[in-house]
């Protein structure tokens, strides 16, 4: 199972955010929706071996995590509006420290980056990291951490200081594009192309 966690530094944590203003009042929720779509959707299906957790750190209740689990998802389309509607549904239910189901394959809880990092062996995508193509397949982690359009904060940098860092190439790309590149690399290796 491949997992992605994407931090949304300003993503709204109130279910009343408007679907017609995801970048503004949604707190760049559009970026998180694209990351979810890139993580889970194939041309004619869903990656059942992938999860995407989005960490919503915006107001009014920072520290909400929403998980999209490809093995159980139903009725999700790859467009931003549909994914944002699922996020709203997850935000509408009370959340505690353990995941609670908001729908098939849609889970939510309260949590921090430290909580996330304690659950899996992560790698961070960083342009100054080791070229991912130089990393042996068996050394690739099962989980990848990405940030939205903002750099990791100083506190986040301290938490990820000792985590392996990988680069996807010489150009800096958007988080959703980075997810596609990682999955393509994994697909190529699993299929014996590399």
Curated annotation (Swiss-Prot):
Q: Which InterPro entries match?
A: Alpha/beta_knot_MTases, TrmY, tRNA_m1G_MTases_N
GO MF terms, alphabetically ordered: S-adenosylmethionine-dependent methyltransferase activity; tRNA methyltransferase activity
- Kindly state a single biological-process term from the GO annotations of this entry: tRNA methylation
- What are the alphabetically sorted keywords of the record? Cytoplasm, Methyltransferase, S-adenosyl-L-methionine, Transferase, tRNA processing
State where the protein is found. Answer: Cytoplasm
Q: What is its EC number?
A: 2.1.1.257
Q: What's its top-level EC category?
A: transferase
Q: Does the keyword tRNA processing apply?
A: yes
Q: Name one GO cellular component term.
A: cytoplasm
Keyword set includes Transmembrane: no
Provide the reaction this enzyme catalyses.
pseudouridine(54) in tRNA + S-adenosyl-L-methionine = N(1)-methylpseudouridine(54) in tRNA + S-adenosyl-L-homocysteine + H(+)
One Pfam short name:
Methyltrn_RNA_2
- From which domain of life does this come? Archaea
Binding-site residues for S-adenosyl-L-methionine, renumbered to this chain: 125
Q: How does the record describe its quaternary structure?
A: Homodimer.
Primary role? Specifically catalyzes the N1-methylation of pseudouridine at position 54 (Psi54) in tRNAs.
Q: Which family does it belong to?
A: Belongs to the methyltransferase superfamily. TrmY family.
Instruction: Give the protein's recorded name.
Output: tRNA (pseudouridine(54)-N(1))-methyltransferase
Source organism of this protein record: Methanospirillum hungatei JF-1 (strain ATCC 27890 / DSM 864 / NBRC 100397 / JF-1)
This chain is encoded by the gene named: trmY
């Amino acid at each position: 199972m491949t997992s992605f966690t994407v931090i949304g530094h300003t993503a709204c944590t109130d279910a009343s955010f408007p679907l017609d203003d995801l970048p503004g009042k949604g707190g760049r929720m559009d970026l998180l929706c694209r990351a979810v779509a890139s993580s889970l959707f194939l041309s004619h299906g869903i990656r059942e071996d992938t999860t995407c957790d989005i960490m919503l750190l915006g107001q009014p209740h920072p520290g909400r995590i929403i998980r999209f689990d490809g093995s159980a998802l139903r009725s999700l389309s790859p467009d931003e509006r549909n994914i944002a509607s699922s996020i709203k549904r997850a935000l509408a239910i009370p959340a505690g420290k353990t995941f609670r189901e908001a729908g098939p394959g849609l889970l939510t809880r309260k949590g921090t980056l430290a909580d996330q990092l304690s659950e899996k062996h992560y790698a961070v995508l960083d342009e100054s990291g080791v070229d991912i193509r130089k990393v042996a397949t068996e050394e690739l982690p099962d989980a990848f951490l990405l940030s939205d359009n903002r750099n990791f904060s100083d506190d986040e940098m301290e938490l990820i200081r000792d985590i392996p860092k990988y680069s996807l190439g010489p150009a800096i790309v958007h988080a959703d594009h980075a997810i596609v590149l990682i999955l393509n690399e994994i697909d190529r290796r699993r299929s014996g192309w590399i």
